[in-house]
């Protein structure tokens, strides 16, 4: 037999024998699981083919049900575990796992996101240890609670579980899954660009089942792109969680199933058992009562059939029933697009800009330098972690934080590294350069001032509770920043000594002044908090001076001369306040609908620019709040912008979470 034929023969053995193809594995996993196969020195007539079959048999029989030959696929679906140390969630999960392990006819377990409550490193490691007590394979996808409040910038989930996407086969069925976002910023879900690229590279086939934490409807900003790809690859069902209840949905012809949470929530913990026989699917809830799992009659029965994409799309790729602002708003000509391109990665931070160049970071660990003349990429540098930090620029130094646990300074001209300074955990905060110091916060309970030239610490304040994701307010008298422990800190910029701490009165850490970029005017600090309030604090003492209810969430801004402070509510209003008298100057309807974006409001000349979580911008007259224009850049959250005046108007350098980068121009009539 020729060498080629022999290799083909061995491949045939592997493909025919393996009932399961594993998701992406780390190098350590590959070495551990497949070490016996690494030393196969096959030759015709040797016993190596028999040895290979034995290795495969050992893999497939790590749990006996994987090699069951009845043709029926049976698996457990758990969702919304919300593991939190010391809470009832751990007890509920343990009871569900114990019950699953008693059911010998289950092939595997699917876990549909929100494994943790707050995405901390400790929560992720602890829930992984609990899931490892399952006595059969399990597959997970992260949910919004694992991604939005992740102190590691979504790195720990990938590191601990070994993957963010998966694809495997079981008894003729293909199962695929990916993350849902939103990565670090409050916004509707968005399947990341990296996951979308992975979906686009999947081969078309039949009998595919997709898992994602979210329902694939308008809960996900790019739902139409996801469902279009799912139909292309032959998906016949999408399963998920998020709603904490058993629900049957229809995604333009593609059936969707959402499973209950494992949480008892005043009742019993539980999960679902899904069975597929031929093309017939049934879903039954299992409630764990005491030590007994009670399986109920199926709450869903379906016949799974191929699905054609019958959705009608407009020229921009949006479905005709797209419920939000569409691109036709751009036809008014109030704002002109000079150039625009799409990065292959998510972008979750703003820009640094100087002259005809700008720099931005990506969630795939890239730093790119672009020309403002035409948007061309002048250079790109890669780093070993996701980047959620807006870079700061001073002279040749471009400085940013990375989820690999370092602050980097690179040469702005060519991307070469000048220095890096290690933190104890991921650095999600955006640096501020003032004088010869770099001010930046991390996830290790420490805020630092670093020497710009060397990266060596000038001072460190290690009394921070919660992790830092914002850009601090820095001036000659103080450094002000919030954390995900409900606290706002003010430090001395010279030595890092604590000046004061303000704490939100709401006990939940969800109500933290952590995403807002604070502003300061007339000796007052202004912040917006997810309790929907705008706070004015005495900059010297941290005492509350005034609280405005139901006008804000996490986004604020300030007039260039400090004469007005701006904030926006979740429900289509934007307001302006006088920082001197603390009176309301105006309040306007935005026309943009429900919006939870934390991105700061920008102001230039006599106009105020409000970014949204759906790729839109809206402009208002600064003097009275009159709506002036609207523009759609892309379909996802707008990141911090660069805005500058030009003769007769201004320009806006804009990026969005789904990877769009654009230069816009507005001509103003005085």
Task: Locate the predicted segments by residue.
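Extracytoplasmic beta-rich repeat domains
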Residues: 331-352, 378-393, 417-434, 443, ...
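Active-site environment of divalent metal-dependent phosphoester hydrolases
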Residues: 43-45, 84-86, 117-121, 144-152, ...
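Short loop/turn segments that connect beta-strands within beta-propeller blades
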Residues: 371-375, 411-415, 451-455, 492-496, ...
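His/acidic metal-ligating clusters that form di-metal
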Residues: 99-108, 169, 176, 185-255
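Binuclear metal-dependent phosphoesterase catalytic core
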Residues: 247, 254-320
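N-terminal active-site segment of His-dependent metallophosphoesterases
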Residues: 22-126
